[in-house]
Amino acid sequence: MSIKYVATSKLPTPWGVFAMHGFEDSETGKEHVALTFGDLSGDAPVLGRIHSECLTGDALFSLRCDCGFQLQTAMQRIAETGRGFILYLRQEGRGIGLLNKIRAYELQDKGANTVEANEQLGFAADMRKYDMIAPMLAHLGISRVKLMTNNPRKVNAMKDVGMDVVERVPLQVGKNRYNEAYLKTKSDKLGHMMSEEHFKAQHQD
């Protein structure tokens, strides 16, 4: 495996002080990050999340997706629980990159849904891979998880690298009038597990 650990530092956040662990993929040149909180040792399952980079949602507060809401909620839940992890993977735009994501947004502005936009650009609906999580989790000493996700591919990715996923914890947050159609497409076309009550929730302005 081409993933190597680089360094660890403290990361003060509104929810507490996390540890930030840096990893480098020598094959792709991508730099991935793991955030941890509390003591992860022992046999008890660890609350965690696989989160793919989303500059627009995570840093620019975009309402077109639910990514930023999911990241903040995951960090808050982990801090409240007292222990947990987030694997922050550099796979912008479901793996197509930032500029192609903007191109996809342009197509969505013209009426395409998130899957159709990717396909019109010549990409699969979801280009992400998760093989890098195995060495990251091994470095952190994690083997049993409670995974915060609505995406069955992430559950399967954990199981594929030998993780014991004892529970899938739904993470349905951030629905608003700008991303309602996007969330519906993720449920209908990508198999994301979201309750009907989520789609009936009151719109945020």
UniProtKB/Swiss-Prot annotation:
It catalyses: GTP + 4 H2O = 2,5-diamino-6-hydroxy-4-(5-phosphoribosylamino)-pyrimidine + formate + 2 phosphate + 3 H(+). Pathway: Cofactor biosynthesis; riboflavin biosynthesis; 5-amino-6-(D-ribitylamino)uracil from GTP: step 1/4. Its cofactor is Zn(2+). GTP binds at residues 49-53, 70, 92-94, 114, 149, 154. It is an enzyme of class 3 (hydrolase). One of its GO terms (molecular function) is GTP cyclohydrolase II activity. The keyword Nucleotide-binding applies. It comes from the Bacteria. Binds 1 zinc ion per subunit. GO terms for cellular component: cytosol. NCBIfam families: PRK00393.1, ribA. Catalyzes the conversion of GTP to 2,5-diamino-6-ribosylamino-4(3H)-pyrimidinone 5'-phosphate (DARP), formate and pyrophosphate. This is GTP cyclohydrolase-2. It comes from Shewanella amazonensis (strain ATCC BAA-1098 / SB2B).
